[in-house]
Amino acid sequence: MKALMLLTLSVLLCWVSADIRCHSCYKVPVLGCVDRQSCRLEPGQQCLTTHAYLGKMWVFSNLRCGTPEEPCQEAFNQTNRKLGLTYNTTCCNKDNCNSAGPRPTPALGLVFLTSLAGLGLWLLH
């Protein structure tokens, strides 16, 4: 009887944990999440959220499911020396727990829109 209860509990836990979903997209200023999807976590994996910053300015976020090939490893202030970007990665294991990321920086949105307007004027001449 105990073995049957243990087996039932194990199957139930596997079924519940197998249905955990994560957000999956690249979030950029002004546009928000690009190609928003949902991914299903594999057993033993976690949702990942990586935020990239240039100095203190948020540049983009990458939301995804961890995989056996790329398991979630929390890291703070990892720097890419070539690009000068700083990355912060967080992990979580609840349904849709990796949020869509920080709000866009207003100054960056203004720079982006001004650049688009300038490009449009240049193309018209």
UniProtKB/Swiss-Prot annotation:
Extent of the signal sequence: 1-18
PTM comment: N-glycosylated.
SUPFAM superfamilies hit by this protein: Snake toxin-like
InterPro entries documented for this protein: LY6_UPA_recep-like (IPR016054), LY6G6C (IPR039237), Snake_toxin-like_sf (IPR045860)
UniProt-listed Pfam families: UPAR_LY6
GO molecular function, one term: identical protein binding
CDD domains in the cross-refs: TFP_LU_ECD_Ly6G6c (cd23546)
Disulfide bond positions: C22-C47, C25-C33, C39-C65, C92-C97
Prodomain positions: 100-125
Keyword Ion transport: no
Compartment(s) where it occurs, according to its Swiss-Prot or TrEMBL record: Cell membrane
One GO term describing the cellular component: side of membrane
PANTHER family: LYMPHOCYTE ANTIGEN 6 COMPLEX LOCUS PROTEIN G6C
Protein name (record): Lymphocyte antigen 6 complex locus protein G6c
The species this protein was found in: Homo sapiens
Gene for this chain: LY6G6C
